[in-house]
Amino acid sequence: MKTLLLTLAVVTMVCMDLGYTTICYNHLSRTPETTEICPDSWYFCYKISLADGNDVRIKRGCTFTCPELRPTGKYVYCCRRDKCNQ
């Protein structure tokens, strides 16, 4: 009986984890904070800062893979926790 209960507990925990989705911020630099629930298997949040003269633009959202770093004045931050791209 104990084995059956332990098996059911493990199966329940595994099944609960399968449905997990990441929550990321998705607002731009000068807009109020908003979030989005990422699509299945999109586990990363990103934050891209782009310097344009005296102005800095920031874009946030969900992504399947982390954006590539390029030497173009961009700062890219990628993470895997809920709301980690603030």
UniProtKB/Swiss-Prot annotation:
Cleavable signal peptide: 1-21
Cellular compartment(s): Secreted
Main location: secreted
Origin superkingdom: Eukaryota
GO MF, one annotated term: toxin activity
Keywords, ordered alphabetically: Disulfide bond, G-protein coupled acetylcholine receptor impairing toxin, G-protein coupled receptor impairing toxin, Neurotoxin, Postsynaptic neurotoxin, Secreted, Signal, Toxin
Tissue: Expressed by the venom gland.
Family annotation (Pfam families): Toxin_cobra-type (PF21947)
PROSITE patterns: SNAKE_TOXIN
Disulfide-linked positions: C24-C45, C38-C62, C66-C78, C79-C84
GO cellular component, one term: extracellular region
SUPFAM superfamilies for the chain: Snake toxin-like (SSF57302)
Oligomeric form and interacting partners: Homodimer; non-covalently linked.
Family: Belongs to the three-finger toxin family. Short-chain subfamily. Orphan group VIII (haditoxin) sub-subfamily.
Role: Antagonist of muscle and neuronal nicotinic acetylcholine receptors (nAChR) with highest affinity for neuronal alpha-7/CHRNA7 nAChRs.
Protein name: Muscarinic toxin-like protein
Organism per entry: Bungarus multicinctus
